[in-house]
Amino acid sequence: MKKLLIATALVSIAAMSAPAFAADAPTIPIIVKDTTSFYWQIVLAGARKAGKDLGVNVPELGAQSESDINGQISILENAVAGKPAAIVISPTQFAALGKPIDEAAKKVKIIGIDSSADSKAFTSFLTTDNVQGGRIGADGLAAAIQAKYGKAEGDVALITSIPGVGSLDARAKGFKEELAAKYPGLKLVADKVADGQATTALNIMTDLITANPNLRGVFASNLIMAQGAGQAIAENKKADTIKVIGFDSDDKTVKFLADGTLAGLVVQDPFRMGYDGIKTALAASKGEKIETFVDTGANLITTANMKEPRSVELLSPKVK
């Protein structure tokens, strides 16, 4: 009941903060994993811009943490009850959101973004090819290790934020497959899973440094893990010997990239994901033909290319 009340409050607050349109303007809520994360704020900014451009009411909804699975389910149920034109959602957990999305799709068109769920009911799905994102992470890590040590050889580790998240599982899959296929000299000595908190990533990274004196590289597969891993590298002064590739960006990780604490960032286009999610949902609500899958892309940004125009655009998106 408590989570339901919280979810209801979030729905109400988001609805009140949405821009005013004509009474007959369609409403398309967007439900993200975590409204406090910079990444998701960029997604919401894209959705907000689409709402203004297309004349759509876009309530911005989501729990306060990616681990609040029940909270997101309650928010989805409340959104469906409001009888919107469509709903855009990034599921927090692959298995747990499957049935709720199946049920929601019986009443309204569901557009998925970023992470999938155990459901075939999505009308369309927009995401980074996260398997490819993992491969890009492996390639970036191998290049950084080779630049430092002369060869892409040595011990490496993987840090994943939360278990059972479709996008993160796909990144891990791509990372491991790329290591096996292209970099036999890189040995995965640790495959760690956290609880979605940067402090946990900090502790995991610190423990890896202590337990693995020959560690040469780490792939931290989302923003929060990159924050924590980068902090541990900075505190232990290991940037020269341990190369870390993160995933996604914010002010903290961009600073880490600029000063060499992080060797690179695999960066998505979350603004496009939010914008095109609303655009696709509106088209679907009108019965227009839409793509069932859209790859929104990912790019490796390093210190060497971070000042290029496209890199600047991705690293410094406008969220207001």
Task: Say what each PLM segment does.
Residues 17-19:
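N-terminal signal peptide c-region/cleavage motif recognized by signal peptidases
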Residues 3-5, 21-320:
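A residue-level marker of the well-folded mature domains of exported/periplasmic proteins
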Residues 7-15:
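Bacterial N-terminal signal peptides
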